[in-house]
């Protein structure tokens, strides 16, 4: 599920920035530029397949809400990443997927989420 959400996210990011990227690539930081570059590589057939899987998954989430009003779960399994960690995640797919394991399903389905802080690191993050 996280892989589907990630592929859709990068493709949608590339589409959103299509008028200014890559012509103004230098104005983008390395993290966002990397996401857009990855999004530009997602082909049309893959996007269609992802759309069908997204619709099927969204229907399952809708069905879950037929028997309950709320799903409680963690948002992240570790502290928020630093900018250096984010930059590393551009090339480390496993690290990216681990960070989004809990939120990706709802990014994919489009259901609303509320995230509440549950602590902080020594750096205050």
Predicted regions and their residues:
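Flexible, acidic loop-helix segments that line cofactor/substrate-binding pockets
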Residues: 1-6, 29-42
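Charged, often glycine-rich, active-site loop that binds/positions anionic groups
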Residues: 2-16
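A general alpha-helix detector
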Residues: 16-17, 35
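Non-catalytic, usually N-terminal nucleic-acid engagement modules in DNA/RNA processing proteins
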Residues: 21
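A glycine- and small/hydrophobic-rich beta-loop-beta segment
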Residues: 25
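Glycine-rich, small-residue loops and helix-cap segments
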Residues: 31, 42-125
